[in-house]
Amino acid sequence: MTSFSEIPKSISEVSKQSIDIPKFAKYVNPNDIKDFNEADKKLNVEKIKCINEELEGKKHPITGVKYKRCIVEDGDGNLKEGVFPQFKSEFDAKLPPDEYKSTDSVQFNRANKQLKEAIAENSNLASKFTPQQLEMIESGRTPRGYTWHHSEKLGILQLVDTKIHDQTRHTGGKKFWGGGTENR
């Protein structure tokens, strides 16, 4: 339970604690915005059609994965608004910008390398995997039972449960920042 002493005393304290503020937020003046549609116009946000967007704010009926509306940046600095699944990730890998539009193979190799390095430094992370999975990670492979998901967040690959990923139809980050299907 949170005590009152743990609650920030002012908005400025909250903003100091928040580290997940999107780049586009600097273009928004709250005094100029009266509703979300007006904000979208000022930001030049393109609304895009997403698979299962009708599940916004709901959970997938089979997997229980929640869908959330987000504004994301593509690899070219454009803003897109869509509805995306919020998978439980065991590990997030961050690609360098020059690999955003690389093939899946290049991206997954980079992610596997980051996972291997993170496990070497963090025994709590290692404890999430079986000995066989750790062996696969050590040899540079994606651990059995997991898939690298292209998050809607620019350059982020999430290590998620393969079965849940495969059963949760969605539009992923590969479409926006990863070069689309031609870069598979």
Descriptions of predicted regions:
Residues T2-T147, E152-R184:
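Nuclease and nuclease-like effector domains acting on nucleic acids or nucleotide cofactors
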